[in-house]
């Protein structure tokens, strides 16, 4: 596994900023679904062709990698719904391009987790782009809670550290087997 784009971070930042933090995210993608990306196709593609998206896998991003203000300047005075739609489209296309470029098979299930798994508009766009070769499923179909995957991962990493078991991360981060973190025994 690897990071392929901004996920929800730019969408969430936009919604929080646009609503004076009244809302934390675009529930079900309702605002984005009202928007139009067609007038901004050039800006979306320009953003996706930036150096940021020219990576080799495995890859890891941080929220600091994605500059909402820079993208908003590219859009000019676009209506809020259009901005939300464009940000959602960047996330959707970054996932699509990562699968297209790096998935060794031409047919596989794609499991969504995190807040994006609950964003109906984002999921519908992914289904359209990926088609039937890559069916979209919510990770809850495997008995896992979408919002808790990252927390569960860090708990697992902590457990491995406490028992002194090295973790093999080469396929997901490129790192050599190692013990992560430090335990204060005081």
Enumerate the language-model features and the residues they cover:
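Catalytic-loop motifs flanking and including active-site residues across diverse enzymes
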Residues: 6-11, 87, 122, 147-150, ...
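Phosphate/pyrophosphate-binding loops at sites that engage ATP/ADP/AMP, CoA/4′-phosphopantetheine
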Residues: 97-107
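Generic structural signal for residues in well-ordered beta-strands
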Residues: 134-136
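Glycine-rich phosphate-binding/hydrolytic loop that grips phosphoryl groups
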Residues: 89, 140-186
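Conserved ATP-utilizing enzyme core subdomain
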Residues: 1-92, 173-186
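Glycine-rich phosphate-binding loops at beta-strand->alpha-helix junctions
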Residues: 107-129
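Buried hydrophobic packing segments
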Residues: 11-14, 71, 95, 99, ...
């Amino acid at each position: 596994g690897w990071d392929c784009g901004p996920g929800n971070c730019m969408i969430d930042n936009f919604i929080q900023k646009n609503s004076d933090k009244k809302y934390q995210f675009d529930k079900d993608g309702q605002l984005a679904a009202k928007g139009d990306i067609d007038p901004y196709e050039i800006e979306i593609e320009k953003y996706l062709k930036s150096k940021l998206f020219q990576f080799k896998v495995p890859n890891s991003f941080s929220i600091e990698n994605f500059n909402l203000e820079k993208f908003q300047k590219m859009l000019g005075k676009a209506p809020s719904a259009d901005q939300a739609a464009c940000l959602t489209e960047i996330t959707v296309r970054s996932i699509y391009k990562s699968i297209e470029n790096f998935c060794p098979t031409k047919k596989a299930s794609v499991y969504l987790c995190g807040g994006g798994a609950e964003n109906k508009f984002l999921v519908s766009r992914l289904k359209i782009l990926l088609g039937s070769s890559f069916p979209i499923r919510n990770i809850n179909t495997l008995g896992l809670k979408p919002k808790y995957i990252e927390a569960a991962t860090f708990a697992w990493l902590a457990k491995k550290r406490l028992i002194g078991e090295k973790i093999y991360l080469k396929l997901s981060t490129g790192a050599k087997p190692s013990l992560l973190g430090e335990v204060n025994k005081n």
